[in-house]
């Protein structure tokens, strides 16, 4: 089974995707994490991807498709997986559907622009283990100490500023809304109210996916 999490930046795709992945024992694949790992290398792909990320622009389809197809060719993903951040538009969806045969379920997290901006501006992560926190909604239990690994070193993403965030939201509306309409014809398409709190969103997703 393949589960695709769709939604604008800051919708909580990564948070919810990881939770569901853990409960149903499927690998969680975040295209953003893949790109950030590539950026840390000195490859030509890193230079190309970084130029788009710094401007808050979406990476061209041919680059994204090539990377994701190669990544999914691993035997680790033969039994299914959860995708976070891919596909982002109709062209990517058509490419993806051309080489996968498994049943696809789609979870769309619908969130207001105002809440998205607040979530993203307050977002930071533990530099050691990657645990995500938020200045407004999810601080560590002990101030400046990671709940998971106890590190005291945190980092904000450099592309998380209000101007870039608004541009990313606008790009999402232009590029991804047609994809939402495409998947609405799928019996396994589920729209989730992403304005609710983390636990309420998780409960709703579990209900539609029939996870006990």
Curated annotation (Swiss-Prot):
Description of its domains: Consists of three domains, a large central CORE domain and two small peripheral domains, NMPbind and LID, which undergo movements during catalysis. The LID domain closes over the site of phosphoryl transfer upon ATP binding. Assembling and dissambling the active center during each catalytic cycle provides an effective means to prevent ATP hydrolysis. Some bacteria have evolved a zinc-coordinating structure that stabilizes the LID domain.
Gene3D superfamilies documented for this protein: P-loop containing nucleotide triphosphate hydrolases
Family label: Belongs to the adenylate kinase family.
Name recorded for this polypeptide: Adenylate kinase
Record carries keyword Cytoplasm: yes
UniProt-annotated binding residues for Zn(2+): 126, 129, 146, 149
PROSITE patterns: ADENYLATE_KINASE (PS00113)
Reactions performed catalytically: AMP + ATP = 2 ADP
Group of enzyme by EC: transferase
Function recorded in the entry: Catalyzes the reversible transfer of the terminal phosphate group between ATP and AMP. Plays an important role in cellular energy homeostasis and in adenine nucleotide metabolism.
Subcellular location: Cytoplasm
Species lineage: Bacteria, Pseudomonadati, Pseudomonadota, Alphaproteobacteria, Rickettsiales
Organism whose genome encodes this protein: Rickettsia bellii (strain RML369-C)
């Amino acid at each position: 089974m393949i589960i695709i999490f769709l939604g604008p930046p800051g919708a909580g795709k990564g948070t919810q995707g990881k939770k569901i992945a853990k409960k149903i024992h499927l690998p969680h694949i975040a295209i953003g994490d893949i790109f950030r790992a590539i950026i840390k290398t000195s490859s030509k792909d890193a230079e190309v991807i970084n130029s788009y990320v710094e401007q808050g622009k979406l990476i061209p389809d041919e680059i994204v498709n090539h990377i994701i197809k190669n990544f999914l060719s691993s035997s680790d993903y033969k039994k299914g997986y959860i995708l976070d951040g891919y596909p982002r538009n109709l062209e990517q969806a058509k490419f993806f559907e051309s080489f996968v045969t498994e049943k696809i379920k789609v979870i769309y997290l619908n969130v207001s622009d105002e809440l998205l901006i607040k979530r993203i501006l307050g977002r930071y992560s533990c530099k050691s283990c990657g645990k995500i926190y938020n200045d407004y909604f999810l601080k560590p239990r002990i101030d400046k100490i990671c709940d998971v690994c106890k590190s005291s070193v945190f980092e904000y993403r450099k592309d998380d500023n209000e101007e870039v965030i608004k541009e990313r939201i606008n790009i999402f509306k232009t590029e991804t809304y047609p994809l939402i309409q495409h998947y609405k014809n799928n019996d396994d398409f589920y729209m989730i109210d992403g304005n609710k709190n983390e636990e309420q969103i998780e409960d709703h997703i579990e209900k539609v996916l029939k996870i006990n």
